[in-house]
C-alpha cells in the first residue's frame, strides 16, 4: 500500500510555504496517528507544504519507521530546472542530469558542478554551445535558480494553485 499525504491549507498569492507551517503542522499532528493506525505497513509519500517540515512532523508523530516515509523534497524544483535547461539548449529533459538540493522552494540551491548534459559537464557543454552559436548568451546561474525558486509562486498568482506539476512529480516518485 502507498499513502500520499497532501493535507493542509494551500498557498495564497504572495504567501511563502513557511507561512503555512503552523496550521499545516497542527493538521499533520491530528491526522498522522490516525492514518498510521489504519495503514501501519504502507509506504508514505508526504507532499504537504512546507514539505520538509511536514515530513519531519509525520515521522515524529506517526510512529511509522523512517524507512517507510518519503518527502517529495525538491523533485518539483528539479523538474523545473530540467525544463528550463531543456528549452535553453533545445534538448530532451531525459538527457539533462541536474538536480536541485536543499529545502523545496526559496532556500533551495543548484550544485552546478554536478550538472551534466548527456554525460558532459554542463560547463563544458555551455562552452561548446556558446562557441557554436554566436548569438547564444551564457547561462546565468542566478537567474535560473530564481526561476526554479519562484515558479510555484508565479503559478499560484496566475492560477490560484499548483495542481498538475505536483501530481506529475508524485507520479515520478511512485
Where do the model's predicted regions map?
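N-terminal Rossmann-like NAD(P) cofactor-binding module of classical short-chain dehydrogenase/reductase
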Residues: 3-4
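C-terminal substrate-binding/catalytic lobe of Rossmann-fold NAD(P)-dependent dehydrogenases
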Residues: 62-68, 77-174
